[in-house]
Amino acid sequence: MTPTPGEADLTNTPAPRARRSVLSRGSWSETARIAGILRKETVGGAVLLVASAVALVWANSPWAESYFALRDLKIGAEPFGLHLNLTLGTWAADGLLAVFFLVVGLELKREFVAGDLRDPARAALPMAAAVGGMVVPALIFVAVTAPVGDGATRGWAIPTATDIAFAVAVLAVISTHLPAALRTFLLTLAVVDDLLAVTVIAVFYTDEINLTALGLSIVPLALFALCVQRRIRSWWLLLPLGVATWVLMHESGVHATVAGVLLGFTVPVLRSVAAGGPEAGPGLAEHFEHRLRPLSAGVAVPVFAFFAAGVAIGGVSGLTRALSDPITLGIILGLVVGKPVGIFLTTRVLTAVTRANLDDALRWIDVFGVALLAGIGFTVSLLIGDLAYGLGSDRDDFVKVGVLTGSLVAALIAAVLLRVRNRHYRAVWLQETADTDRDGVPDVYQSQRD
């Protein structure tokens, strides 16, 4: 029928495009994988908290001297002129944390090759949010410490890191049923945070470089890469190559934990065609991650925390002095205010710019709660504090007080916010776990089954 004058012809009017949703639920395979990672990190987080508490109590007990004597005990040698006569605290920071960063490297590569970060549309939000969560706390720290002078701003990167083990331990304590999309967002944020942290450590906290040692480190790294590309799993071969890479990287002046990330990057995520292709099963990266994550979360990080978290507070007067220092204040404000505000505002702005909608199951208060969890910076923050001001220095002690206080405050505020929303989270969780046909895949993922 021909429309009369004044009437619009609606027959050929295109339907309005549906707005894209951000922080929506991912695939079942990715959700299940992330749930498994977070379960392991929860146990690691509990061990981390215990190790930190023991260090704090010991460092402020009548036996404090024995704690610091143990931390500063030198073990090692200097074969072939290599500087490997290190204190236990340094072995923990440079050596054990290399295992942690090896797992980070494996996780990063998997995310970029087969995880959420392989899709530019899905990767843009957490990557931008992580950058925002790095820039804002760094600016706050610099603004607070700049008037002090004397290199106080050197620790600008301290409040920029997220400790995923600590964060998921908080979630376990408050017993919240965080939706899968928020868990994925938190883990992806932490993964990108770790990538940024490694970059910052390598670029900004390397004073002098021994180019010969750095060049030589490429040899065992390349041999390691050759072996894993050929799917060689023999630890009697891979371990010496990994250790040699670490030793030469340490000797070069670049922080040795960078070696862990580079080794992780060389491991293939997907099976080659010769090995049966991607459908033949998990790649070597997943195999290594499965073996190494318990060692990283249950041993490497807690031992580092034990040696890094011990600070002699000196009673009420000492605590007051530490809390009034600009370095401590800059860290606390960076973690509690800068980190969540940076993540939240970046997420909000990017959502508005791309004309997307927040997923129907979520509210912006949920995003802010997760952003507060990202303000729990512990392991990497303490490591950067050691690099910025020197292990055992007065400023390093202020760093420890700031990181511990800021992380605790961020955790408490996040716990309150997320706990208030827990009834809604539980309803979402029941929907996400309902499996009426008992085939092992929840009903909401049936259309995405892969």
Curated annotation (Swiss-Prot):
The keyword Transport applies. It catalyses: Na(+)(in) + 2 H(+)(out) = Na(+)(out) + 2 H(+)(in). It is found in: Cell membrane. GO terms for biological process: regulation of pH. Keywords: Antiport, Cell membrane, Ion transport, Membrane, Sodium, Sodium transport, Transmembrane, Transmembrane helix, Transport. One of its GO terms (cellular component) is plasma membrane. Pfam families: Na_H_antiport_1. Its main location: membrane. GO terms for molecular function: sodium:proton antiporter activity. The chain crosses the membrane at residues 43-63, 86-106, 124-144, 155-175, 185-205, 208-228, 234-254, 258-278, 299-319, 326-346, 364-384, 398-418. It is a multi-pass membrane protein. PANTHER family: NA(+)_H(+) ANTIPORTER NHAA, SODIUM ION/PROTON ANTIPORTER NHAA-RELATED. Belongs to the NhaA Na(+)/H(+) (TC 2.A.33) antiporter family. Na(+)/H(+) antiporter that extrudes sodium in exchange for external protons. HAMAP family: NhaA. This is Na(+)/H(+) antiporter NhaA 2. It comes from Mycobacterium sp. (strain KMS). The lineage of its organism: Bacteria, Bacillati, Actinomycetota, Actinomycetes, Mycobacteriales. The gene is nhaA2.
